[in-house]
Amino acid sequence: FIKNFYMQVQQLPISKFLKTANSLIVPVYQRDYAWKRLNCDKLWSDIQQLISNKRSSHFLGTIVTINDGYGKYLVIDGQQRLTTITIFLLALSHYLRDKENPTEEEIQLQKVFKGYLIDEESISQETRIKLKPNKSDLEYFEKLFDEKKEIIENNSNIVNNYLFFKEEFKKNEISARKIFEDGLQKLHIVSIDLSRGQDDPQLIFESLNSTGVDLTAGDLIRNYILMDLEPQEQEKKYKKYWVEIERLTSDVAEFIRNYLIFKTRSWVKKDDVYLFFKKFAIDTYDNNKELILEDLLKYATIYGSFIQTQKHRNEKISSCLSRI
């Protein structure tokens, strides 16, 4: 399908990708950072194999972006990998920083790593850190860059994976230069940079998203509704509708399956929810995203009463619902 698009495709080391980008923004509709210690352990094992020359390179996956100009990119696909590599580099930099007697080379390496993580030319503190995760992850992510704050283990994947990498660097005692030059720089990606208004990010996302942590039907539907909107509209509709839909329904995919069954009077299998929803949205609402979200929120409120995420305003009805 590539010939039908205006995309720019290139294979390159992920370190080069990070170096040349000034700003990488994860849109609000993207799910939270989901990589666990197991995923990071596998990545670290791959890097160690590269260091020991058992492999000459390792393909990390595809990263899809929309270039908004001036080195600013919206991350459409690949945010899990990008976030993990950023955490890896930051942990490596802090491992060197915390050494009692760092060598001159190690001090210089810290500055090198900083160039992959920080946009030194940015005059705004908000845009100084190159990668900007979605709002759910942002607080924990920014804390890692705060030299004054102690990083302790908690329920954040971002923090815990940072601590995992840092501990591995201490245990293995491989030189930071070797980790970077013989390991990280051999991690390759395929970068797909889309042209806004010309390429269809949703179609490309669906075609490529087959690796990493599986997306639920709820994730895919959220992306489908919000992805092709302008960033400001994405954030507005996400806050106004989607956050409420998630809060009211607990399991968005299951809610939408029941919503579709009710609206179409047809049985919908769990594996078919996403494709069924897309057809329904086009046939019923001519793909008008505002109307779709309004209707979803209306039924999410009713659904929430049934599953008791929201009490019904009539106490007798609420009491009856709780006994179903």
Language model segments and positions:
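Short, polar/flexible loop-turn hinges at active-site or ligand-entry regions and domain interfaces
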Residues: Y95-T103, T211-T216
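"Short basic amphipathic alpha-helical interaction patches in structured regions
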Residues: Q79, F88-L89, T103-E104, F205-S207
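Extended charged low-complexity segments that act as oligomerization/scaffolding linkers
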Residues: E105-L144
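Short alpha-helix boundary/capping and kink motifs at helix termini
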Residues: F5-I76, Q80, T86, L187, ...
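Polyanionic (Asp/Glu-rich) segments that form extended negatively charged tracts
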Residues: K130-I324
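Short active-site loop/helix that positions an aromatic residue
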Residues: L82-D98
